[in-house]
A protein has these predicted regions:
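Active-site mouth loops of central-metabolism enzymes
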Residues: 18-30, 73-83, 111-114, 203-205
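Alpha-helical scaffolding within the catalytic cores
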Residues: 1-2, 56-57, 84-90, 144-145, ...
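Structural preference for beta-strand elements that scaffold enzyme active sites
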Residues: 2, 10-14, 45-46, 69-73, ...
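Acidic (Asp/Glu)-rich catalytic clusters
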Residues: 4-10, 41, 59-69, 89-98, ...
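Active-site groove signature of glycoside hydrolases
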Residues: 92-113
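Short, acidic/polar
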Residues: 25-39, 81-96, 141-149, 205-213
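Beta/alpha (TIM)-barrel catalytic core signal, keyed to glycine-rich beta->alpha loops juxtaposed to Asp/Glu
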Residues: 108-224
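N-terminal binding-site loop/beta-alpha segment at the start of enzyme catalytic domains
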Residues: 1-70, 124, 130, 213
Length: 224
């Protein structure tokens, strides 16, 4: 599957790396690498991480034993230009990559003013893309209004919105509202992959229904 106008080819499932980091399960680099490697060997080629997750070393360790193609998305809460530049370079450095495929404004709970408040960080991502440090500029969000807003922001290539069958974590609307926003973004040729299809683990006993709910949204290219 291809992520919108960015043209980045990814597997239908995306491996979200957050749970293995210190913010959640806090497993060792070695153990985390083993789990990531299993995912890669099973056919997943798309990893989603972030500066705040402290999991770059887990990914780097896994990739030492893997020669296939891997697409990596990361993100940062940086608001200013220089801060975001360091975040992008840090990701390349710690994961030993020449470039990061997708780099997001990490904006989970921010409102539609995010693009104004973080204009410096966004300008930096645009420059990093021109310089080849990243391949695509994105935003990760829990808010319906931010997805709608991002659809109209030319610089944004990829949107990573929260969506699950019970609406866990969605800000400012229902799952149906979020799907409408996703459709608008898709019409604007944005690449979209779904965040928290299992509601951060709350829907673990309903895995099949939860994954299928998101898979049936035609405008979603991959599911994390």
């Amino acid at each position: 599957t291809v992520l919108g106008k960015a043209g980045i080819k990814v597997s239908e499932l995306c491996f979200g790396i957050l749970p293995m980091g210190p913010l959640q399960a806090d497993i060792s680099v070695k153990e985390g690498a083993k789990v990531i490697l299993e995912g890669l060997k099973s056919g997943i080629n798309f990893l989603d991480t972030a500066q705040a997750y402290n999991t770059y070393l887990h990914i780097n360790e896994a990739l030492k034993d893997y020669s296939g193609e891997v697409v990596i998305a990361s993100k940062s809460h940086a608001t200013e230009y220089d801060e975001m530049k360091e975040a992008g370079l840090e990701a390349c450095r710690e994961m030993k990559r020449d470039y990061i495929d997708i780099f997001h404004l990490h904006a989970a709970k921010e409102d539609k003013n995010v693009f104004k408040k973080r204009s410096g960080a966004l300008a930096c991502l645009v420059d990093l893309k021109k310089e080849g440090v990243i391949r695509a500029v994105g935003i990760s969000t829990h808010a319906v209004e931010v997805v709608v807003q991002a659809a109209g922001v030319e610089e944004i290539d990829i949107i990573f919105p929260i969506i699950n069958k019970v609406g866990l974590g969605i800000i400012g609307g229902t799952p149906e509202d979020m799907i409408e926003a996703i459709k608008k973004a898709h019409q604007a040729a944005k690449g979209l992959y779904a965040m928290k299809a299992l509601g951060g683990g709350y829907l673990i006993k309903q895995i099949e229904e939860s994954i299928n709910y998101v898979r049936e949204i035609n405008e979603i290219d991959s599911t994390a």
